[in-house]
UniProtKB/Swiss-Prot annotation:
Assembly with partners or alone: Interacts with host SGS3.
GO biological process: negative regulation of gene silencing by regulatory ncRNA; symbiont-mediated suppression of host innate immune response
Stretches for region Disordered: 94-113
Biased composition (Basic and acidic residues): 96-113
Cell location: Host cytoplasm, Host perinuclear region
Organism, as annotated: African cassava mosaic virus (isolate Nigerian) (ACMV)
Span of the signal peptide: none
Family annotation (InterPro entries): Gemini_V2, WCCH
Protein name: Uncharacterized 13.1 kDa protein
Keywords tagged on the record: Host cytoplasm, Host-virus interaction, Inhibition of host innate immune response by virus, Suppressor of RNA silencing, Viral immunoevasion
Annotated function: Through its interaction with host SGS3, acts as a suppressor of RNA-mediated gene silencing, also known as post-transcriptional gene silencing (PTGS), a mechanism of plant viral defense that limits the accumulation of viral RNAs.
Length: 113
């Protein structure tokens, strides 16, 4: 947990509130299994709080709120059935094909005849 005697305080009251909210959500995140919907929603809520741009934070919050309203309390502890492809969280982006160049053909070994 954050120790106020060791670390510096944020510049504003809003910054302090955001920091305390994130610390609480990180503690709450540990109560959910990593592959559950509840864990994913808590991570989305942390990203809403960390957004620096108002428009980006509002967009993330609407995405979070629609996912929360569409799920029941029992579903929060269930494993996620289909992966999320939201553009704002890099943990959901697929990493396949990132290390290959786009227009390079693969060479094939040909046996000597």
């Amino acid at each position: 947990m954050w120790d106020p005697l060791v670390n510096e305080f944020p510049d504003s009251v809003h910054g302090l509130r955001c920091m305390l909210a994130i610390k609480y959500l990180q503690a709450l995140e540990d109560t959910y299994e990593p592959s559950t919907l509840g864990h994913d929603l808590v991570r989305d809520l942390i990203s809403v709080i960390r957004a620096r741009n108002y428009v980006e934070a509002t967009r993330r919050y609407h995405h979070f709120h629609s996912r929360l309203e569409g799920s029941s309390k029992a579903e929060l502890r269930q494993p996620i059935q289909e992966p999320c492809y939201c553009p704002h969280c890099p943990r959901h982006k697929s990493k396949t094909g990132l290390d290959e160049q786009a227009h390079v053909q693969k060479a094939h070994d040909v046996q000597d005849v």
